[in-house]
Design a protein with these regions (language model features):
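Beta-strand-rich interaction surfaces with strong enrichment in secreted/lumenal proteins
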Residues: 42-44, 72-76
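Extracellular/periplasmic metallocenter environments
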Residues: 28, 78-113
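Asparagine-centered strand-capping/turn motif at beta-strand->loop junctions
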Residues: 56-58
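Short beta-strand/loop motifs in extracellular/secreted proteins, especially
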Residues: 52, 62-64, 106
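Sec/Tat signal peptide C-region and signal peptidase I cleavage site
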Residues: 19-23
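N-terminal edge beta-strand
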Residues: 26-49
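Bacterial N-terminal signal peptides
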Residues: 6-17
Length: 113
């Protein structure tokens, strides 16, 4: 009987250890879409001091490069694909970004407040 109890307890402990992190613990997601060589929305607001995930969906056929010198981030997003960028907690302020392949039209900013 003791062996069965120990095995059940060990099994439950293993199950709990392998349980994924709850969604409430995950950083918030901020969606951006690339379409017709533009970002939409062209301004997003995030909470200053809190990390977040930038989810960028490229609806165009061609690739676009998300680039922010302010954030020191560069990421190519293939046409028809979505990428997720984990962003660190930002100080309050405005951070600009562009689509490097279409800098005249693909522009935006992240406002941390």
């Amino acid at each position: 009987m003791r062996l069965v109890t120990m095995l059940v307890v060990a099994g439950l402990a293993g199950l709990l250890a392998s349980t994924p992190v709850l969604a409430a613990d995950a950083p918030p997601e901020v969606a951006l879409t690339i379409e017709k060589n533009r970002f939409s929305p062209d301004e997003v607001r995030v909470k200053a001091g809190a990390p977040f995930v930038l989810v960028i969906a490229n609806k165009d056929a061609g690739a676009e490069e998300f680039e922010s010198k302010d954030l020191r981030v560069e990421k190519v997003i293939p046409g028809g694909k979505t990428v997720r960028l984990r962003m660190p907690a930002l100080k309050a302020g405005t951070y600009t970004f562009v689509g490097e392949y279409h800098e005249k039209t693909a522009q935006g900013r992240i406002v941390a407040e």
